[in-house]
Curated annotation (Swiss-Prot):
UniProt similarity note: Belongs to the prokaryotic/mitochondrial release factor family.
Residue positions where N5-methylglutamine is found in the record: 253
Species of the source: Buchnera aphidicola subsp. Baizongia pistaciae (strain Bp)
PROSITE patterns: RF_PROK_I
Keyword Transport listed: no
Record's miscellaneous remark: The gene for this protein contains a UGA in-frame termination codon after Leu-26; a naturally occurring frameshift enables complete translation of RF-2. This provides a mechanism for the protein to regulate its own production.
Organism lineage: Bacteria, Pseudomonadati, Pseudomonadota, Gammaproteobacteria, Enterobacterales
Sorted UniProt keywords: Cytoplasm, Methylation, Protein biosynthesis
Protein name in UniProt: Peptide chain release factor 2
Single GO biological process annotation from the record: viral translational frameshifting
Amino acid sequence: MFKNNNIINDRITNLVSQINKLKRRLDYDIKKNRLLEINMELKLPETWKHPSLIKKINKEKNQLISVVTQITKIDNDVQELIDILNLENSNNINSILDNVLYEFKNIEKSIHELEKCSMFLGKYDYLSCYVDIQSGSGGVEAQDWASMLLRMYVRWAESKKFKIDIIEQTYGEVVGIKSATIEVLGKYAFGWFRTETGIHRLVRKSPFNAHHRRHTSFSSVYVYPILDDAINVDINTRDLKIDVYRASGAGGQHVNKTESAVRIRHLPTGIVVQCQNDRSQHKNKDQAMKQLKAKLYEQLINEKKCQQKILENNKLNIGWGHQIRSYTLDNSRIKDLRTGVESKNIQSVLDGGLDLFVECSLRNGL
């Protein structure tokens, strides 16, 4: 490296160290070798006789390329910077210093973006997801709180450039919502949203009480991945109870006059899904079946982990013990009860500024 500038040498050493850590965490060498194997497989005529296999291989290839290409580029950029500095002598360093510092910033930015990707190592983190919001104890207050959470998550998803669709929304009798389901489409949507599953508690002076007494409300959030076609879930139609009804808006106003909304109950498990966002009953049924498939698969995975969860002392409980975050508006404080992270900028968080909480949860392996 450059002999006469310790500061530059230290920064390069730090960059190399960060890259090596990322390589280990993201299994760079394994992914790189697997990519070579896939390219060899795709050259075999026999492989192309099986369209389903080609689809599966190409999907895996695209996931590998994303990581391997980024790390390789950062590696090359750092090496190029080292080569440039080694060619320069101390008299010429000032003439290229601005360019060197500019390249440092670009490389550090690329590493930071890749570090975010390294938070998503779960099997389904790369998938899109559904977000269910359900008002809990607290009556009108809880229903208003559920609508605030819906708004918060919609804005956060938009800030991440995800495509969103509110596929079900049941309005409260006075204000707010009783329940809602959001479809969030985009790479790593489930990875970003999954740690939001749990009970969210709101404490505030009630706007619905003449004396503005302090009130505590609860709403639950449940996040589950939208499964791709490669994951099979067998659903027997005889196990389903399908109801159709008219979709209604706030205050009982009908969105349309036909019975296009669909509710499906899976009788063996009691799982209920519903969709009312489209005027087509057929499309709503297809969407509801996608939700049911995702929920059944999630339940299957959870059952496999059940024995391990029983042994854990920190098993989640219903009510107060199930909380993941507390939003205390009159004290201007939002606190994550799992990580201890706090924010006093309440409006920013409720407007979708969740990165502080979510990134900390992901880095803590939640």
